[in-house]
């Protein structure tokens, strides 16, 4: 999560009881026939020491093999071989989600991020979705006719997703942080439960890594324009 300098946030530490039995252990004690997944089915996280997965899925594991920076993961790694052989498809393995809650002017914020990424990351091939907005069930039920101060938060939120290749993830991550921290605080507001507004909008950035490559048609991709 990125916030404006000086904005205080709470840090919570959780102490885990290491003596607590696992769920599978408890179920087995109740007579359930449970079997845990073998460690050999798990992939080393972003490692180059080799893959622990067995069988066909271990061949050319995207986490353990070097990535072609220009073209992304080799097409032999793509699960859908029809897409792998089709040059009209671009392959991604990393996803960023930009999220914010109860923000006024949220469309403008994500439009700004999208426009900045298009220009500042022109040498990389990425895919960027439009902004999606979601509301809680409470906000849907209360109706639009009721006016006045709100008694509960609406939990209205936005999400925007950016797909890229793992080799480019550090550049996407750094640029997202830069454009979010460069926001003008008076331009974006968040609404409190009592209806008042504040010029500080927390923006959350989550990063996900895919085990299987995601393929998108090039019509939906912002392609590398460094050569133009």
Curated annotation (Swiss-Prot):
Pfam families: Herpes_UL3. This is Nuclear phosphoprotein UL3 homolog. Phosphorylated. GO terms for cellular component: host cell nucleus. Belongs to the alphaherpesvirinae HHV-1 UL3 family. InterPro entries: Herpes_UL3. It comes from the Viruses. It is found in: Host nucleus.
């Amino acid at each position: 999560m990125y916030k404006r300098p000086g904005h205080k946030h709470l840090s919570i530490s959780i102490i885990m009881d290491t003596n607590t039995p696992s769920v599978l252990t408890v179920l087995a004690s109740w007579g359930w026939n449970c079997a845990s997944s073998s460690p050999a089915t798990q992939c080393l996280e972003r490692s180059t020491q080799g893959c622990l997965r067995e069988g066909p899925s271990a061949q050319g594991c995207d986490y353990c093999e070097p990535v072609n920076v220009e073209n992304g993961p080799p097409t032999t790694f793509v699960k859908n071989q029809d897409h792998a052989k089709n040059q009209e498809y671009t392959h991604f393995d990393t996803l960023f989600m930009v999220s914010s809650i109860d923000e006024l002017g949220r469309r403008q914020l994500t439009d700004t991020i999208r426009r900045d990424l298009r220009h500042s990351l022109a040498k990389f091939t990425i895919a960027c979705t439009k902004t999606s907005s979601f509301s809680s069930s409470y906000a849907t039920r209360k109706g639009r006719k009721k006016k006045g101060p709100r008694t509960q938060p609406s939990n209205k939120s936005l999400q925007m997703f950016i797909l890229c290749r793992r080799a480019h993830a550090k550049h996407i991550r750094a640029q997202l942080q830069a454009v979010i921290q460069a926001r003008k605080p008076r331009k974006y507001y968040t609404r409190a439960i009592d209806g008042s507004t504040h010029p500080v909008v927390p923006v959350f950035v989550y990063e996900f890594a895919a085990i299987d490559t995601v393929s998108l048609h090039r019509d939906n991709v912002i392609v590398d324009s460094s050569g133009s």
